[in-house]
Amino acid sequence: MIQSQINRNIRLDLADAILLSKAKKDLSFAEIADGTGLAEAFVTAALLGQQALPADAARLVGAKLDLDEDAILLLQMIPLRGCIDDRIPTDPTMYRFYEMLQVYGTTLKALVHEKFGDGIISAINFKLDVKKVADPEGGERAVITLDGKYLPTKPF
């Protein structure tokens, strides 16, 4: 039976335990996700308390991380999403995303509306990918793909 969480702290505590186990076992998120049939980003989001895993994926991930049955069950529960405190992020990486939306948020909104009309980009019917690519000018670049279904506003 599908279960839902109403307290975000239990999943945040589990995320801390998962990250500790991940570090002790020297595993990458890609290695943990391998064999689940799910995207690395989706499994990572679940491990960090933002998504629910199907039972078979939760068991596989749990085995890789030596999680107990309660933790495996928690990974299958629908979480209380959006666990970032209601303030401007202070973590430098998260802040840069906040900054990108401060600078380009209105541009993204205008371009989405111009190309699609009045509506939103779904974060439910959504895919996320992060790639590391060489920068022709030296160093490396992050290519982040946000792939969400467009949902039009419907008059009623």
Curated annotation (Swiss-Prot):
Q: What is this protein called?
A: Cyanate hydratase
State the EC number(s): 4.2.1.104
Q: Which HAMAP family does the UniProt record give?
A: Cyanate_hydrat
Reactions the enzyme catalyzes: cyanate + hydrogencarbonate + 3 H(+) = NH4(+) + 2 CO2
| Signal peptide stretch | none
Keyword field:
Lyase
GO terms of molecular function: cyanate hydratase activity; DNA binding
Quote the function comment for this protein: Catalyzes the reaction of cyanate with bicarbonate to produce ammonia and carbon dioxide.
InterPro entries (UniProt xref) = Cyanase (IPR008076), Cyanate_lyase_C (IPR003712), Cyanate_lyase_C_sf (IPR036581), CYNS_N (IPR048564), Lambda_DNA-bd_dom_sf (IPR010982)
Output the SMART domains linked to this UniProt entry.
Cyanate_lyase
Family, similarity comment: Belongs to the cyanase family.
- Active site as annotated: R96, E99, S122
GO biological process annotation, one example: cyanate metabolic process
